[in-house]
Regions:
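Bacterial Sec-dependent N-terminal signal peptides
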Residues: 1-22
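Beta-propeller blade termini and top-face loops
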Residues: 21-772
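Residue-level detector of functionally pivotal "anchor" positions at catalytic/ligand-binding pockets or at interdomain
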Residues: 768-784
Length: 785
């Protein structure tokens, strides 16, 4: 363990001055500077060389946004992978092994990458996922390597936050085009299409349609690199609504330049009007460049949803739009015609193409040797061999939700696909596939829970997969833990879990938007039981967060708490329920949409008194009850901002102490919000101290040392050994999203759930053994009452 206290003190002194002002962090430049501070902290941290051990799962990969390759020419393909939240990965042996090559750059979310046609060692990477997901994140501009990924240089555009496409001039590598949809949650001017002619030293914005409109796709004519087509989309994402195209949106469409972006012409003939054009993918037929395709998420209403009809998540179904529609031009974009959905059979097929979330997809490719062979990416890979008139699925054996594809221009049978399960390869035009799962450890965990079995087990939910568990085997030594295959358990892709400590078998799991179920680990799924009533009579509709908080009482595990817009309590293990709070959110009717919002996002109970509960909401409210729910008091106070409450921890060492973290991700705010109260929430102090960068997702106390706190953020893990006065980077994790963490109280192992790199464990002995002591300073009940 490193001892660098003097250097730490200097750095802390510098950063503490910066942290006194709690303004939101809204610019990419600020975020980059904050990450530089994080790396400086890592270098001087007393705990920076502790090793996080990868726990798996080796049988699950994660979402990728793009894939490109360099043809073999007598050797193996070199494959480059852009992941949604795991950085960039490279294989020099056609997928036998992959290595991360973009680990400490201030972000791990990648929107697109491009390999230079003139020099395969030159690769451009655009950070910030352009697909809008519940876990998509903002990036910090574009980067370039000239040595095959050994070193990287930041090349600007950090204010774009997202990148959807990068194109490099085939003959002049200094000419590069970068498309950005812009900020996901807020309006900004740094979006559209950018061009550099000097390798990234200077940029010019060459296509811009307003602070809500960005460029989602572009393609270059293989005959003339000055001819480009670009698609724009005016998108609005709200915390309570999926992104969509509205009737007042006038900036959606397809644009063409013939002079390298100096001037643009909108292409409209035969295409839907602007207010119906959602996300649009475009591609050119290399074999006949006059043929151009547009894959449009068409927002024209196809039919009205019936009353009581539900979507795939059990929410009220919205009116059904026309959705995935393919258009074709045979005259280089001058005129277009719809080619898909012209028969009832084709219309039915295309209606299920993208599920209910077409804005997530919007990618298509044309076979480089056949202008009539077209691939569109949705839930599955869909192929047409007749120019879009009919489609059929291929690759149904690989993971769903397709986001990227690369076809070898010299061998169109060789296809690489990027999807929510990683990367897959086909050598026969999609008839057969092989997936790189253990080779790409990219699992996107949302949560972690443990039990007290021997060996202990950990549980977690994984984006677009399910919920899983595994054993943590310490028998070979605390520093020799091996990654494992994980097994299915109760839950869904976004869940919280609670394990009954009396049997280490009964498991409770929240599921989509507030649903709750119970089972046993050994008998699942056969004994799964749904627990919650549909609605309480006086409530119009129950609202539950994507991961609604569920809590088993530490005083009596038969008592179960569950957070919707109000707190529910069961005293018989979930058999019956009563509501013990009013609606704790602002309950603004203008913010009720098709995404559950204005819900409880955090919940905790004091181990000292079962009547003391804390609850926080996604719209920034914070509450306390001292009498088991009979009366609730709002304890949000200045200087707290109105931000999503990401975690509440009632101290297990001191009765009156409670910790709260807030995340500004959905406000494009990377500020660090960490608060402590020592008087039950009557007053709050900022203990973010020298933590340089957020957002903050979780805080935990060490169960055996009352002075130690752990913090999980969007760049890694921090530890404080003095109750939050000073923080240090903990361990050798790469830059990664830490969505949850826990400390096993018996085995003293720290567990982190990362959203992009799987799950890790760390031996906590070097951190807390010298600090462990008897609990002290417990507030008496008299002070509480």
């Amino acid at each position: 363990m490193k001892r660098k206290s003097a250097a730490i003190a200097v750095l802390i002194s510098t950063l503490s001055v910066q942290s006194q002002v709690k303004a939101p962090v809204l610019t990419g430049a600020e975020k980059l500077n904050m990450y530089v501070s994080h790396e400086q902290m890592r270098e001087v941290s007393a705990y920076g060389d502790l090793h996080w051990q990868y726990l798996g799962p080796v049988n699950i990969s994660g979402r990728c946004t793009d894939v490109e390759a360099v043809g073999p020419k007598g050797k193996s393909y070199t494959i480059w992978v852009a992941s949604a939240s795991s950085g960039v990965w490279k294989s020099v042996n056609e997928g036998v092994t992959f290595e991360p090559v973009f680990e400490h750059k201030g972000t791990s979310t990648i929107g697109d990458l491009a390999v230079c046609p003139a020099d395969p060692d030159v690769v451009w990477v655009g950070t910030g996922e352009a697909n809008i997901f519940r876990s998509s994140n903002a990036g910090c501009g574009v980067w370039k390597t000239t040595d095959g990924g050994k070193t990287w240089t930041h090349m600007g555009l950090e204010e774009t936050f997202t990148v959807s496409r990068i194109l490099i001039h085939p003959e002049d590598p200094d000419i590069v085009y970068v498309a950005s949809p812009g900020h996901e949650w807020t309006r900004n001017k740094e979006r559209g299409l950018f061009k550099t002619t000097d390798g990234g030293n200077h940029w010019e914005k060459i296509l811009y349609k307003g602070p809500e409109s960005g460029v989602n796709d572009m393609v270059m004519d293989p005959r003339d690199p000055d001819v480009l087509y670009a698609s724009t989309w005016q998108r609005t994402r709200l915390k309570w609504n999926d992104p969509r195209t509205y009737e007042h949106h006038k900036n959606n469409g397809i644009w063409k330049t013939v002079d390298g972006g100096k001037s643009w012409k909108q292409l409209t003939r035969g295409l839907p009007p602007s207010q119906y054009m959602g996300r649009t993918g475009i591609d050119i037929a290399r074999s006949d460049p006059a043929v151009v395709y547009a894959f449009v998420d068409d927002y024209e209403i196809a039919y009205k949803a019936e009353e009581g009809e539900l979507d795939s998540y059990g929410r009220p179904k919205q009116d059904v739009i026309k959705g995935a529609t393919l258009y074709r031009s045979d005259d280089a974009g001058e005129s277009w015609r719809q080619v898909s959905g012209l028969t009832e059979e084709s219309k039915k097929y295309m209606s299920g193409h993208s599920g209910t979330y077409g804005w997530v997809f919007g990618q298509m490719r044309v076979d480089p040797s056949d202008a009539d062979r077209v691939y569109t990416l949705g839930l599955y890979i869909n192929v047409s061999t007749d120019g879009g008139a009919t489609f059929g699925p291929i690759g149904k054996s690989i993971h769903v939700d397709q986001h990227g594809m690369w076809i070898d221009p010299d061998n169109s049978g060789y296809i690489l696909a990027a999807h929510d399960g990683g990367i897959s390869v086909s050598y026969d035009r999609g008839a057969n596939w092989r997936s790189f799962i253990p080779e790409l450890p990219l699992a996107q965990f949302y949560n972690v829970e443990y039990d007290m079995s021997e060996p202990f087990r950990v549980f977690g939910s994984v984006q677009d997969h399910h919920s899983f568990y595994t054993e943590v085997d310490l028998s070979r030594g605390r520093d020799k833990i091996r990654p494992t295959e994980w097994e299915y358990t109760l839950g869904a892709e976004g869940s919280t879990h609670q394990i009954d400590p009396r049997d280490n078998s009964t498991i409770f799991a929240s599921l989509f938007y507030g649903k709750l179920a119970r089972a046993t680990v050994e008998e699942y799924p056969d004994d799964r039981e749904w627990l919650l009533p549909e609605n309480f009579p006086e409530e119009p509709e129950a609202r539950g967060q994507w991961m609604a908080p569920t809590l088993l009482s530490s005083h009596n595990p038969d008592i179960v708490y569950h957070g919707l817009q109000y707190v529910l309590k069961s005293t018989d293990g979930g058999g019956t329920w009563k509501k013990i709070s009013p609606d704790l959110t602002f309950n603004d009717p203008e913010k009720i949409g098709d995404i559950s919002y204005q819900t409880i996002s955090a919940l905790d109970e004091s181990i000292f008194n079962s009547d003391l509960l804390y609850a926080g909401t996604d719209d920034g409210r914070l509450w306390r009850t001292k009498n088991g729910g009979e009366r609730w008091e709002e304890i949000w106070k200045d200087p707290m901002p109105v931000r999503w409450i990401s975690r509440i921890v009632a101290s297990q060492h001191d009765f009156g102490t409670v910790y709260v973290t807030q995340t500004g991700r959905r406000d494009d705010d990377a500020q660090v919000y960490v608060w402590r109260s020592q008087d039950f929430g009557n007053s709050w102090e900022d203990i973010a101290s020298n933590v340089p960068t957020g957002p903050v997702n979780v805080i935990r106390e060490d169960p055996g040392a009352d002075s130690i706190l752990y913090l999980g953020t969007d760049v890694g893990v921090y530890v404080s050994t003095d109750r939050g006065q000073e923080w240090q980077v903990l361990g050798d994790l790469p830059c990664t999203y830490v969505h949850d963490l826990a400390i096993h109280p018996r085995d003293n192992m720290l567990i982190v759930a990362t959203h992009g790199r799987g799950m890790f464990v760390l031996d906590a002995d070097p951190v807390n053994c010298e600090n462990k002591k008897e609990d002290s300073g417990q507030t008496k009940n008299g002070d509480f009452l």
